[in-house]
Amino acid sequence: HFSIYFAKHGKDYDIDVAFGSFGENPIGMQDKMTSIDVLRMAENLRCKVVVPIHWDVWTNFQADCEEIKLLYDFKKDRNEYKFHPFFWQVGGKYVYPQDKDKIYFHHRRGFEDCFEAPQNIPYRSCL
């Protein structure tokens, strides 16, 4: 959950990447941050990249990261954010600083090697 001590940690440490537990809390629960809390956390920590996590692994907490992107785009200029979000997928990876400018992870689409070897099918076209 959000903590006002994020601001202290942001002053005490140089943070490149911060992970924030993001989700839609059901009634009677408050352990995940909301979309605006994720942005507030990143701003308070003075990190360069914020990665929302856990938003897609619990069905009762499931959230949509596009909400963070929408709020980020709406507020980044006015609030002069010095960070940007990165949206991970389960099984994905993020390597800092190599991936520092990426916004989304996308699994490899495959088939980069198409037509590099003879086709091993009995017909020339695939419907």
Task: Please place each PLM-identified region on the residue numbering.
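Binuclear metal-ion centers of metallo-dependent hydrolases, dominated by the metallo-beta-lactamase
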Residues: K8-D12, S35-L127
